[in-house]
């Protein structure tokens, strides 16, 4: 069975724009706001949202990317290192963090990202933005900003394509 495209380029751009407007509304602009993208695709989505925030509000929002590999609960022997050098690490203490990822599924990636954020500082607030929420949560985690809810079967997968890596913007259900 072929993959089914559920978001094309235009739909993906509209979803990111909607998320951006919701972030502006919730945060009353961009004061004390930091966008944190979960590597790899969340990082690129965070940078795009920051660009839109600058276009709409005229403010530059800091963006940081985090690698949560060492905070995953299926790798208990890891040593909780973010792999960031001091130039890449932003001061997130007392900041309003918007954590950004491409797909929300079981919630385990987000749990690991929360652990990673707390490891480097004490944010004032943390909210979650995802391009796609596909359901099937294993942990009590809910996104504050969702581009598109796409219910899937347990055996299906969601594949997000971003221009920066894949040469196109799209979301597909993989059977």
Swiss-Prot record:
Catalytic activity: UMP + diphosphate = 5-phospho-alpha-D-ribose 1-diphosphate + uracil
Pfam family, one: Pribosyltran
RNA-binding listed as a keyword: yes
Entries under Gene3D superfamilies matching the protein: 3.40.50.2020
Motif PRPP-binding, residue range(s) on this chain: 97-109
One record GO biological process: DNA-templated transcription termination
Record's keyword annotation contains Repeat: no
EC number from the UniProt entry: 2.4.2.9
Keyword entries, A-Z: Glycosyltransferase, RNA-binding, Transcription, Transcription regulation, Transcription termination, Transferase
Molecular function GO labels: RNA binding; uracil phosphoribosyltransferase activity
Family membership noted in the UniProt record: Belongs to the purine/pyrimidine phosphoribosyltransferase family. PyrR subfamily.
The protein's role, per its UniProt record: Regulates transcriptional attenuation of the pyrimidine nucleotide (pyr) operon by binding in a uridine-dependent manner to specific sites on pyr mRNA. This disrupts an antiterminator hairpin in the RNA and favors formation of a downstream transcription terminator, leading to a reduced expression of downstream genes.
Quaternary state and interactors: Homodimer and homohexamer; in equilibrium.
Protein name: Bifunctional protein PyrR
The organism of origin for this protein: Leuconostoc mesenteroides subsp. mesenteroides (strain ATCC 8293 / DSM 20343 / BCRC 11652 / CCM 1803 / JCM 6124 / NCDO 523 / NBRC 100496 / NCIMB 8023 / NCTC 12954 / NRRL B-1118 / 37Y)
Lineage, uppermost ranks: Bacteria, Bacillati, Bacillota, Bacilli, Lactobacillales
Gene name of the encoded protein: pyrR
């Amino acid at each position: 069975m072929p993959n089914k495209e559920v978001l094309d380029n235009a739909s993906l751009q509209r979803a990111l724009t909607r998320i951006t407007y919701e972030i502006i509304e919730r945060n009353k602009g961009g004061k004390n706001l930091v966008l944190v993208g979960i590597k790899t695709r969340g990082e690129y989505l965070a940078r795009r949202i920051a660009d839109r925030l600058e276009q709409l509000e005229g403010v530059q929002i800091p963006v940081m990317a985090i690698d949560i590999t060492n905070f995953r609960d299926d790798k208990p022997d890891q040593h909780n290192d973010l792999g960031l050098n001091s130039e890449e690490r932003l001061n997130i203490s007392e900041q309003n963090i918007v954590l950004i990822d491409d797909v929300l599924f079981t919630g385990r990636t987000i749990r690991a990202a929360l652990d990673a954020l707390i490891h480097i500082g004490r944010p004032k607030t943390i909210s979650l933005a995802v391009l796609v929420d596909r359901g099937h949560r294993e942990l009590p985690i809910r996104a504050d900003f969702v581009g598109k809810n796409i219910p899937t079967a347990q055996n299906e997968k969601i594949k997000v394509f971003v221009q920066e890596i894949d040469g196109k913007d799209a979301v597909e259900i993989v059977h």
